[in-house]
């Protein structure tokens, strides 16, 4: 599995701001979107382009445009919505697929409860977004769902990842690509990432 920990100074700075315990909902939400945008920049660096001729101000001009790759952004509800706008800044014409999965706090197992995928998803590259890759259960379940629907090109974008979640994802889906702003220390006994960000969903939606 291709694993990319994005080490750009802006990413590290913004993620560091997000780790503040008393950060406001507004600021956390803004930063989640901004880091999501920067991760998208990295994750789409290998998209192919083709030369086309357009009408410029001084006549015909040859430019490069992305070659035919259709994209669907897949936020995992609910926290993934906090990164979605940042992703769409770079791929505004992407279609949105939505997957709802929550983690049972006792068993730590993923529980699917909603899905709405775009049509012809087998023709699209999926950018799956979720702030945290902890145990990996929710992400694995989401990718299972996408593959069962025919999607084969899948990239995962997360703000922070635990080594345990990375290992689980790699074992289940070695063909996906992972882009993260940080590979953190690991999980505590409750399955939370340390040092992590706390409950990203609560911080994004103001329910903490």
Curated annotation (Swiss-Prot):
GO BP: any one term: uracil salvage
Activity regulation text: Allosterically activated by GTP.
Top-rank taxon: Bacteria
Assigned keywords, A-Z: Allosteric enzyme, Glycosyltransferase, GTP-binding, Magnesium, Nucleotide-binding, Transferase
InterPro entries named among the record's database cross-references: PRibTrfase_dom, PRTase-like, Upp_B, UPRTase/APRTase, Ura_phspho_trans
Enzyme category, top tier: transferase
Residues that, per the record, bind uracil: 193, 198-200
Pathway stated in the Swiss-Prot or TrEMBL entry: Pyrimidine metabolism; UMP biosynthesis via salvage pathway; UMP from uracil: step 1/1
Catalytic activity reported: UMP + diphosphate = 5-phospho-alpha-D-ribose 1-diphosphate + uracil
Residues the record lists as binding 5-phospho-alpha-D-ribose 1-diphosphate: 78, 103, 130-138, 199
Pfam families according to UniProt: UPRTase
EC number per UniProt: 2.4.2.9
Cofactor(s) required for function per UniProt: Mg(2+)
Free-text function comment from the UniProt entry: Catalyzes the conversion of uracil and 5-phospho-alpha-D-ribose 1-diphosphate (PRPP) to UMP and diphosphate.
Family membership: Belongs to the UPRTase family.
The protein, known as: Uracil phosphoribosyltransferase
Species assigned in the record: Edwardsiella ictaluri (strain 93-146)
UniProt gene name: upp
